Structures are given as C-alpha cells and as structure tokens.
Curated annotation (Swiss-Prot):
Produces ATP from ADP in the presence of a proton gradient across the membrane. The alpha chain is a regulatory subunit. It is a peripheral membrane protein. It is an enzyme of class 7 (translocase). It is found in: Cell inner membrane. Its EC number is 7.1.2.2. Signal peptide: none annotated. It comes from Nitratidesulfovibrio vulgaris (strain DSM 19637 / Miyazaki F). One of its GO terms (molecular function) is proton-transporting ATP synthase activity, rotational mechanism. It comes from the Bacteria. PANTHER family: ATP SYNTHASE SUBUNIT ALPHA, MITOCHONDRIAL. It catalyses: ATP + H2O + 4 H(+)(in) = ADP + phosphate + 5 H(+)(out). ATP binds at residues 169-176. This is ATP synthase subunit alpha. Coiled coil: none annotated.
Length: 502
C-alpha cells in the first residue's frame, strides 16, 4: 500500500490544525509519613481545611490540620498502598456525597458508594457533607407528631417532626430495636428514613437491613454503613454523609428521619484521629472540640418554616453508656444538645419490661406540643401514675398494711406497666394506642388479672378493628376524644369484656 506525498502532507496539516495545547496545572505535595488512617503531607501550601487531596491509586484524603510546614490528612480508605515519598495532588473540591431519590433502598458506605451489590448509583446531584445548620429565622417550633409506634414513647416522651431525641442506655438494652420500630412505624407517613451505622459489626448491619427488607421498610430507607473494620476517618465522616442525604428532603419540603447508631463510637473514632494528628487531649482524652463535633451535626435536624418549604429532619442519636453512667463526658454533651432523651435500663430489660424505658429519667422537652390531643387526654396522668406506683411499690415491700386507695394505685400501676410492654417489630398505630390507654387509665382494665392484660389488649383491639372500626377511624381523623367517641369507646370495651375470658 502506497500513500501519496500530497496525502501525507494533508494528514500532517489536519493534525497541526486540530492540535490544541493544554496545560494542566495542579499543586502537588509529598507524603512525609502515613499510618492509622492519617498522612502528613508536605508541599501543598494552598490547601484548605476539609479539602480533598488525591493520593496514588485514586485514594482520597481530607485535610484536617493546617500546620506551618505540613498538613495533616485523614485518609478516606485503606492506607496500605500509600508510602513515604508518594505524590499528592490538590483537587480544590470539598468532600461531597450523592443525594436524591436514587439513594433510597440502598446500603452505602460513607463515600456514597453502594455496597449492597445492586449495581451502581445513578445520582444526579451531589452535596458537601459539611453544611451549615438552618438559622433561627429559618426554623419553626416543633408542632407535628412523628409517631414511633411504641406506646411508652408516644404516650410519655412524644417525638415531633424536627426534634432531636436521644436514645441512651447500656449495651444490649434494646436501643437499636427502638429505632428500627420507629422506622417501621413510618410506612404510611411518607417520612424518608436514614440509618447510619457507626462502628457496628458487619453482621449487625446485615441483620438490620434484612429486618427492614422483611417488613417492607427498605423501600423508604437508606443505610449508611461505616463498620468497626473501617478506618476511623470513615467512621467519623459517616454521620455527616447520612445527614447530607437526609437534609435533601428537609430542604425540598419533605420530611425525613435519621438515626445515628451510635455517636459514642463516632466520638471514639474522632478521638483516635485527633490524637494521631497531635491535637491536645482534654477530658477522657477527647479533643476540645468533641462537643462541636456533635452539636454541628445535631443542629442540622430542624423543622423549617413555611416560606422555606416547611420540611423537617428528625434525629434519633444513640449513645451507649458504661454501667449506666449518664454523667460521663459524651453522654452529658449529647443530652445537653438534644431536646430530650429516652433512657433504657438493663434492670428493666432483664425483668422482662421491654422496651426497657425508664419513665422517670426519660423526657421530651418539645414533643408535648406535637402530641395529638386524644393522646394527651388519655396519657396525661400516666407518667405521674407510674412514678407514684414505683414509689409505692418500693414502700409496699416492707409488708406494711396498705389502705384501699394505695392498693388501688398499686394495682393500676402494675396493669399500666404490663400494658406498656410491646413485642419487637410491632409498632402500633396511634388510634389503637389511644384506645388501649383509655381502657387502662379510665379503670376499665382494673378487674382484668395482671397476667391477662396483654391478651385483653390484643383481643380488645381486634374486636374494635373488626366490629367497631368507626371508633378507631374517628379517633384517627378527629385526633381528639369528644364525649360521643368516649361514650362509644366505653360501651365497646364493656361489650367486649362480657365475652372476654382470661
């Protein structure tokens, strides 16, 4: 094959015309040292705090420390392939994660990459993980209920949309179970749920995902997982990644719920990073800004005012205590940031009272305004009744003779405790809760044996659903107990009692 001379010259001319000189400038540096997920980099003089740097092999790192002669970088992945002398490139970008409906139903890592084997994530929008919380003017007070389906919480420590309610307790007291029930209860509310697993075992996260899938809740839930085997920087950043994904719905006028399981492990990961970055340690060796670590995260949960779309983000952070010590550093920090706490106690758990909620120590500081009127009417005195019952039960142990009124309070209290027990993964609709609380607090269960209370409640609710569905529907729509509903409910319970056999 011969090419003519004029053809060669034509090809060369075309090549010259299409040649474009492109100079790409990037500021580079060199790795001084690396270990435990932290790298020291020399030479990137203009790097900014929280900026991403690119290491060999595409590994990203986030700038945390800016010092005179080098920068401290948290590596967002395994550091095994990085060695001293490796080149590092500035990206000029802030760490961002995918947001939008595409993340729903997926299990992601803190970088927003899918780890569930269901194919790539086709996200159209990305947002930075560190965003400013809404200001004072942008907010509105909490006034809409966010039912959890758990009787003890919805009656005595109600949660509203936009609230931060801490779930606190020792290990193995059912903290995660409470939060999973809260997710299951959102099936028909349109609230999007996000579950952030920080420092959990992989088996635990797999079990949570499996449970949500089994109950049909995975379609409106996203799991962000930074397990115990992940490097500390990923455990630290995972909560912010999840928050950014959830905020997307708050900002477009929808409602979202986010669960951080748990912030104790996030604080431990942050402590590890801070000590490796040679930041000065404070109380319990945590760095001085560990309060800010949690406050800037939890302040992003808010009820937004009507002019900004009236969306909300509700947060349920979990804190694990050691031997019930709520006065330790991290628990007191998070208690002071949140709008109340649900305290779970091992003694109650072991006594078979599950969920093991200590009513005396649990409180909701803003949820009362969000509680529906019907629930206020039936559960208003419940906390007081239970507190009196606990006090009298301790006194009655001495075996002294009790008068009729005291005995009646003890009997009613024992029935209330029994009524508040609830099986796992069975959240109860609010109208059914109101009906059973009404029967208990108005003395309609006083003649039912304590051991038969749960059977009585289940059969009574079945009776109401099948034969008197109009009563439950009226409670659901009117959200209050007027004289007519009350009379019909009382008559229905009396009718059911005639045929009930303990």
């Amino acid at each position: 094959m011969q090419i003519k001379a004029e053809e060669i010259s034509k090809i060369i001319e075309e090549q010259i015309q299409s040649y474009e000189q492109r100079v790409e400038m990037s500021e580079t540096g060199t790795v001084l040292s690396v270990g435990d997920g932290i790298a020291r980099v020399y030479g990137v003089r203009n790097a900014m705090a929280m900026e991403l740097l690119e290491f060999p092999g595409g590994l990203m790192g986030m700038v945390l420390n800016l010092e005179e002669d080098n920068v401290g970088v948290a590596l967002l992945g395994e550091d095994t392939g990085i060695k001293e002398g490796d080149p590092v490139k500035r990206t000029g970008k802030i760490f961002s994660v995918p947001v939008g409906d595409e993340v729903m139903g997926r299990v992601l890592n803190p970088l927003g990459q899918p780890i569930d084997g269901l194919g790539p994530l086709e996200a159209k929008e990305f947002r930075p993980v560190e965003l400013k919380a809404p200001g004072i003017i942008a907010r509105k007070s909490v006034h809409q209920p966010m039912p959890t389906g758990i009787k003890a919480i919805d009656a005595m420590t109600p949660i509203g949309r936009g609230q931060r309610e801490l779930i606190i307790g020792d290990r193995q007291t059912g903290k995660t179970a409470v939060c999973i029930d809260a997710i299951l209860a959102q099936r028909d509310t349109g609230i999007r749920c996000f579950y952030v697993a920080i420092g959990q075992k992989k088996a635990t996260v797999a079990l949570v995902a499996d449970t949500l899938r089994k109950h049909g809740a995975m379609e409106y839930t996203t799991i962000i997982s930074a397990t115990a085997s992940e490097p500390a920087p990923l455990q630290f950043i995972s909560a912010y990644s999840g928050c950014t994904m959830a905020e997307f719905y708050r900002d477009k006028g929808d409602h979202a719920l986010i669960i951080y399981d748990d912030l104790s492990k996030q604080a431990v990961a942050y402590r590890q990073m801070s000590l490796l970055l040679r930041r000065p340690p404070g109380r319990e060796a945590y760095p001085g800004d560990v309060f800010y670590l949690h406050s800037r995260l939890l302040e992003r949960a808010a009820k937004v005012n009507d002019s900004l779309g009236a969306g909300s983000l509700t947060a349920l952070p979990i804190i694990e205590t050691q031997a019930g010590d709520v006065s330790a550093y991290i628990p007191t920090n998070v208690i002071s940031i949140t709008d109340g706490q649900v305290y779970l106690e091992p003694n109650l758990f072991n006594a078979g009272i599950r969920p093991a909620i200590n009513v005396g120590l649990s409180v909701s500081r803003v949820g009362g305004a969000a509680q529906i009127k019907a629930m206020k009417q039936v559960a208003g005195t419940m906390r007081l009744d239970l507190a009196q019952y606990r006090e009298l039960a301790a006194f009655a142990q001495f075996g002294s003779d009790l008068d009729k009124a005291t005995k009646q309070k003890l009997d009613r209290g024992a029935r209330l405790v029994e009524l508040l027990k609830q099986p796992q993964y069975q959240p109860m609709p609010v109208e059914q809760q109101v009906a059973s609380m009404y029967a208990a607090t108005r003395g309609l269960m006083d003649d039912v044996p304590v051991l038969a209370i749960r059977k009585f409640e289940a059969e009574m609710l079945d009776f109401l659903k099948n034969s008197k569905a109009d009563i439950l529907n009226d409670i659901k729509t009117k959200k209050a107990l007027d004289a007519d509903i009350e009379d019909r409910l009382k008559a229905a319970v009396a009718e059911f009692k005639k045929g009930f056999q303990a």
